[in-house]
């Protein structure tokens, strides 16, 4: 197959020596105010309209030393990805979501190196070897007359390749400001979630044309290779945008002249200029032409600006908000930020220059040019024009030139795909008399940044005026930006909010002249106090580690230190739950699993606060193990103190709402290491908020099985008026081949065999067990029952009361019925249904007083095991107490 596109003769640009890159960070000549701005002055030798004899457009920054795989990434699924340590991690260690320091980003100039380019990853980075890249294949399917499968090799050989600069921006850029006002569902981006590169590839229009879209096709859905909790990442754009050459939507394989790096989509990604970065799918595997927008989970539940009155609870309860395509984000809005003065930068007046060059960036979307940037020193009462450097326009002067092995495709374009840099000299004396510096930008659609924030539940597209404050400290001016990214403290917004200022009062939380200070919190957060008043002890890491033992276990939740010693006996999950957390940060597990009641108990065990140094050291010690290497094969998989990675290898449908999930362990001869009657924890992360979802499960596979474990899980889907289960929905949506974290064992009960069990470490002999369960609560009951009945020498008698709604809801029924049939003298099995069909011959109704009195009378050396929905457990507890069962004889899983 060949391409016969008519093109001008290509004249390669010189590749060596590298052309100098114009600095955008240096001082400018003083013009107060410039009118018109210098960038539209045709006589300026730097003017965009000049036609130089030699290329003078920006080329990539000088290459940095090749990054290495960082120690912090080695225990994660991204252990194969080299990274720059300067990047600021926004979601902890993994997944990798980062932005560079704002000053470093600006100082690199118009083009950003791949090492400093911001990264948004929803999960693990696909592992692609260099030798596999040319054979990387993606499909074009759906509403097309000619479905195609194309390799990267074919893109290089059979299609015209082009190069042009594009700025990519995360829709969450500047979200931290929204999170300070009111917590959104998104993590805390600063103002550096934006970067620019020269991308090389094939215009998507060329490949879609060959597939011949059908008449009613309207969208192009894209899907990547990154496996996530809710399926592969995917989204869509309109087909007519793809087919519009002015939009410049590209299938890119190079970035700044180098093959894409792993974090940036190696070996192939979409690049959608002028739109949020979430539309530029990385690790591209599918283009699907459709009549409707994408139904991918990430297209629907991410990258939306819901109406400001929709709070997180309403958004969670009503899926209709997410389904409305009007709220989906595509084109970027005008935005700008100040890079210099930097946060906490100081100017000593006695030795300062006469003027300071205030400077930063601005961008807009949809191909629209930023037409003005304005700066104010008096809270927006007066504005002055800043100079603007449109470095992107310098590429337009070169027709028929080659750059990075492809045609530089800019000479005919009138759209603007890139950011611009603005600057303005301000007299130092004026800064001395001012309290803040504001900047705002306007694009050619006359759309201007607003003064006030538009808060939304995902915190996206935040673009109010960017403001830095000026503190007068004697002879020194100190500058303060609004926030710092991630969990880094600092910024005037946090300071004002802590002082009681209302950040939405139209004056950035400051007192309005003539009015009393408004001391009203924007949002009343119902937060349970988990610390004890008067406890000021600072705990260092060494002291915490002295208490890793089972005898005196200390643990950490949100940087606060707790002594669990006195609760070892009373913990509902058993002493092991506390011992396993000893000396560790248990924040994820504790916050995800425990109720408000449990949180309210915490002040009684609070003994101190981690020092900042200890907190940082502990965060770097996240004990997560990947699958074992062949040189260190562990005989058992589970570790009570370490999260281990298990691979989802298959899903087996048991009923309409129940699946058996098979997880592959490290190696074929490895056992799970879970005692009978105990549980393991499974951890996934919410793809939007990155908060940990952790739940306890009991596998149904034999404890002696090697190489895998099977977990039976009932899926609680969303229903009208009821939100489904976070974890079960996430597990149901992840594809085979996805990793999950596991930790264990946990639980206070263990069956040792032949009537002997251990409760909180104390052995006890029993002659009978009453097992009461409902729904998926059968799993721990099933595990103990099977262990007893498989041992012919075990004389323990078991009575099982199993409650369900419908006959098809009875889980493990075949095995349960077989156990009862083959062991009639040792096992009594009673099924009861609340919505039984007409032909049902078993019991009807809930497990109530009648059944309990008939089958669960008190016995010497008897024990009751209960597992089921909260309502069942609460009811059974009260009824058993009324039947004279002692609390010590009733175990709730």
Curated annotation (Swiss-Prot):
Cofactor(s) in the UniProt record = FAD; heme; Mo-molybdopterin
Chain intervals with Basic and acidic residues compositional bias: 71-83
Q: What is this protein called?
A: Nitrate reductase [NADPH]
Please tell me where NADP(+) binds in this chain.
863-872
Q: What is its EC number?
A: 1.7.1.3
Task: Write out the similarity annotation.
Answer: Belongs to the nitrate reductase family.
Reactions it catalyzes: nitrite + NADP(+) + H2O = nitrate + NADPH + H(+)
Any idea which GO molecular function terms this record carries? FAD binding; heme binding; molybdenum ion binding; molybdopterin cofactor binding; nitrate reductase (NADPH) activity; sulfite oxidase activity
Binding-site positions, heme: 571, 594
Give the residues the record marks as binding Mo-molybdopterin: 170
Q: Which UniProt keywords apply?
A: Disulfide bond, FAD, Flavoprotein, Heme, Iron, Metal-binding, Molybdenum, NADP, Nitrate assimilation, Oxidoreductase
Q: Which InterPro entries match?
A: Cbr1-like_FAD-bd_dom (IPR008333), Cyt_B5-like_heme/steroid-bd (IPR001199), Cyt_B5-like_heme/steroid_sf (IPR036400), Cyt_B5_heme-BS (IPR018506), FAD-bd_FR_type (IPR017927), Flavoprot_Pyr_Nucl_cyt_Rdtase (IPR001709), FNR_nucleotide-bd (IPR039261), Ig_E-set (IPR014756)
Q: Where is this region: Disordered?
A: 1-83
Gene3D superfamilies for the chain: 2.60.40.650, Cytochrome b5-like heme/steroid binding domain, Nucleotide-binding domain of ferredoxin-NADP reductase (FNR) module, Oxidoreductase, molybdopterin-binding domain, Translation factors
- Write down the superkingdom of origin: Eukaryota
Cite the binding residues for FAD: 695-698, 712-716, 726-728, 776, 779
Q: Pfam families this protein is in?
A: Cyt-b5, FAD_binding_6, Mo-co_dimer, NAD_binding_1, Oxidored_molyb
Which part of the chain is the FAD-binding FR-type domain? 641-752
Give any single GO term for biological process. nitrate assimilation
User: Which residues fall in a compositionally biased region of kind Pro residues?
Assistant: 55-65
- How is the cofactor bound, as the UniProt entry phrases it? Binds 1 FAD. Binds 1 heme group. The heme group is called cytochrome b-557.
Partners and quaternary state?
Homodimer.
Residues forming the Cytochrome b5 heme-binding domain are 536-611
């Amino acid at each position: 197959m060949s391409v016969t596109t008519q093109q001008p003769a290509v004249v390669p640009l010189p590749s060596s020596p590298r052309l100098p890159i114009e600095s955008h960070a240096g001082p400018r000549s003083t013009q107060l105010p410039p009118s018109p701005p210098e960038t539209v002055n045709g006589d300026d030798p730097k003017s965009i309209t000049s036609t130089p004899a030699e290329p003078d457009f920006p080329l990539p920054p000088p290459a940095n030393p090749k990054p290495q795989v960082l120690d912090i990434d080695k225990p994660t699924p991204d252990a194969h990805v080299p990274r720059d340590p300067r990047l600021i991690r926004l979601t902890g260690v993994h997944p990798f979501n980062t932005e560079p320091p704002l000053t470093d980003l600006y100082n690199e100039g118009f083009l950003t190196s791949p090492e400093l380019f911001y990264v948004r990853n929803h999960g693990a980075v696909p592992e692609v070897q260099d030798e596999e890249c040319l054979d990387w294949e993606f499909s074009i399917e759906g509403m097309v007359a000619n479905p195609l499968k194309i390799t990267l090799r074919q893109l290089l050989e059979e299609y015209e390749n082009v190069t042009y600069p594009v700025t990519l921006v995360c829709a969450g850029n500047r979200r931290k400001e929204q999170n300070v006002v009111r917590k959104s569902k998104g993590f805390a981006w600063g103002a550096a979630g934006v970067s620019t590169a020269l991308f090389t590839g094939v215009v998507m229009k060329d490949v879609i044309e060959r597939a011949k879209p059908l008449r009613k096709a309207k969208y192009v859905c894209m899907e990547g290779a990154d496996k996530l909790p809710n399926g592969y990442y995917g989204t869509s754009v309109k087909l007519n945008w793809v087919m519009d050459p002015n939009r410049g939507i590209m299938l890119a394989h190079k970035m700044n002249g180098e093959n894409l790096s792993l974090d940036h989509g190696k070996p192939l990604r979409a690049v959608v200029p002028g739109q949020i970065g979430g539309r530029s799918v990385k690790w591209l595997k599918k283009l699907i032409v459709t009549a409707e927008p994408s139904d991918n989970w990430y297209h629907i539940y991410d990258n939306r600006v819901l109406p400001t009155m929709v709070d997180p609870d309403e958004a969670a309860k009503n899926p209709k908000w997410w389904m409305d395509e009007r709220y989906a984000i595509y084109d970027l809005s005008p935005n700008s930020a100040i890079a210099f003065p930097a946060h906490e930068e100081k100017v000593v007046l006695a030795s300062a220059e006469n003027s300071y060059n205030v400077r930063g960036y601005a961008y807009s979307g949809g191909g629209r040019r930023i037409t003005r940037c304005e700066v104010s020193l008096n809270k927006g009462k007066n504005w002055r024009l800043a100079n603007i450097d449109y470095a992107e326009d310098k590429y337009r002067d070169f027709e028929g030139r080659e750059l990075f092995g492809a045609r530089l495709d800019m000479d005919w374009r009138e759209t603007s795909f890139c950011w611009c840099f603005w600057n303005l000299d301000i007299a130092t004396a004026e800064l001395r008399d001012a309290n803040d510096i504001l900047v705002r930008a306007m694009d050619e659609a006359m759309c201007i940044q607003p003064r006030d924030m538009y808060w939304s539940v995902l915190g996206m597209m935040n673009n109010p005026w960017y403001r830095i404050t000026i503190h007068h400290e004697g002879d020194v001016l100190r500058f303060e930006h609004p926030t710092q990214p991630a969990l880094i403290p600092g910024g005037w917004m946090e300071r004002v909010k802590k002082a009681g200022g209302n950040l939405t009062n139209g004056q950035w939380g400051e007192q309005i002249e003539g009015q009393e200070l408004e001391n009203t919190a924007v949002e009343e957060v119902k937060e349970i106090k988990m610390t004890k008043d008067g406890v000021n002890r600072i705990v260092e890491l060494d002291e915490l580690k002295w208490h890793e033992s089972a005898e005196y276990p200390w643990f950490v939740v949100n940087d606060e230190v707790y002594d669990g010693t006195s609760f070892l006996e009373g913990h509902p999950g058993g002493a092991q739950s506390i011992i396993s957390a000893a000396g560790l940060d248990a924040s994820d597990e504790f916050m995800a699993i425990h109720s408000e009641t449990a949180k309210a108990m915490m002040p009684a065990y609070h003994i101190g606060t981690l020092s900042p140094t200890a907190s940082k050291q502990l965060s770097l010690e996240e004990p997560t193990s990947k699958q074992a290497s062949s040189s260190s094969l562990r005989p058992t998989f589970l570790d009570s103190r370490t999260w281990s990675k298990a691979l989802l290898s298959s899903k087996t449908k048991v009923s309409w709402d129940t699946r058996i999930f098979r997880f592959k362990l490290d190696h074929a001869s490895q056992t799970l290491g879970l005692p009978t009657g105990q549980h393991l924890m499974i951890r996934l992360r919410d793809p939007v908020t990155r908060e940990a979802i952790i739940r306890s499960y009991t596998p149904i596979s034999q404890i002696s099985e090697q190489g895998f474990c099977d977990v039976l899980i009932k899926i609680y889907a969303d229903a009208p008026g009821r939100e489904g289960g976070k974890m079960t929905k996430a597990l149901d949506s992840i594809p085979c081949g996805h990793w999950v974290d596991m930790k264990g064992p946990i639980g206070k009960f263990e069956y040792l065999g032949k009537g002997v069990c251990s409760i909180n470490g104390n052995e006890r002999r029993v002659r009978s067990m009453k097992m009461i369960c409902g729904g998926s609560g059968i799993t721990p009951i099933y595990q103990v029952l099977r262990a007893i009945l498989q041992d012919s020498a075990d004389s323990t008698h078991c009575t099982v009361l199993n409650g369900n709604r419908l006959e098809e809801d009875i889980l493990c029924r075949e095995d349960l019925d077989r156990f009862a049939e083959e062991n009639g003298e040792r096992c009594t099995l009673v099924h009861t249904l609340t919505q039984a069909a007409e032909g049902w011959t078993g019991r009807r109704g809930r497990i109530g007083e009648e059944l309990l009195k008939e089958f669960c009378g008190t016995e010497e050396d008897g024990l009751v095991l209960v597992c089921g929905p909260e309502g069942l457990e609460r009811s059974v507890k009260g009824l058993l107490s009324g039947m004279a069962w002692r609390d010590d004889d009733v175990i709730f899983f």
